[in-house]
Curated annotation (Swiss-Prot):
Cofactor(s), by name: Mg(2+)
Upper classification of the organism: Bacteria, Pseudomonadati, Pseudomonadota, Gammaproteobacteria, Alteromonadales
Identification of the protein by name: Holo-[acyl-carrier-protein] synthase
GO cellular component: cytoplasm
Keyword Disulfide bond: no
Biological process terms in GO annotation: fatty acid biosynthetic process
UniProt function note: Transfers the 4'-phosphopantetheine moiety from coenzyme A to a Ser of acyl-carrier-protein.
């Protein structure tokens, strides 16, 4: 049964304006927006990415969609750090919850989140479905 649904869209250029150039690992590691949004493992991928702004935009959209599916948005006990986006062995995106996000998922009797991320030239979008 579906217990939550969330979607988000991000203008990639808006994020890219706040991100240092690819290859500048030191500056990327200090990027304030990335440090706020990304977990430690996501940050390592971001710093090594050839398109860090696009990577961050997609993760931002995915985390916002997940927070909306939880019914809280970011805040009210759920932070960006409580939602981690990874990829399985086939490259499919996965959403994982910890802390306040995991607590909220349990309150909804949720057991799993399904994530779809898409991007094109100007926009990144994500949808999360939570199931019980």
């Amino acid at each position: 049964m579906i217990v939550g649904l969330g979607t988000d869209i991000v203008e990639i250029e808006r994020i890219e304006q706040k991100v240092p150039q690819a290859g500048d690992h030191e500056a990327l590691a200090k990027c304030r927006l990335a440090k706020r949004v990304l977990t430690e493992s996501e940050m390592a991928i971001f710093v090594a990415s050839s398109k860090p702004g696009r990577y961050l935009a997609k993760r931002f959209a995915a985390k916002e969609a997940a927070a909306k599916a939880l019914g809280t948005g970011i805040g009210r006990g759920v932070s960006f750090q409580h939602i981690e986006i990874s990829n399985d062995a086939n490259g499919a995106p996965q959403v994982n919850f910890s802390g306040g996000a995991a607590e909220r998922l349990a309150l909804l009797s949720g057991v799993r989140g399904h994530l779809s991320i898409a991007d094109e030239k100007h926009y990144a979008t994500a949808t999360v479905i939570l199931e019980s």
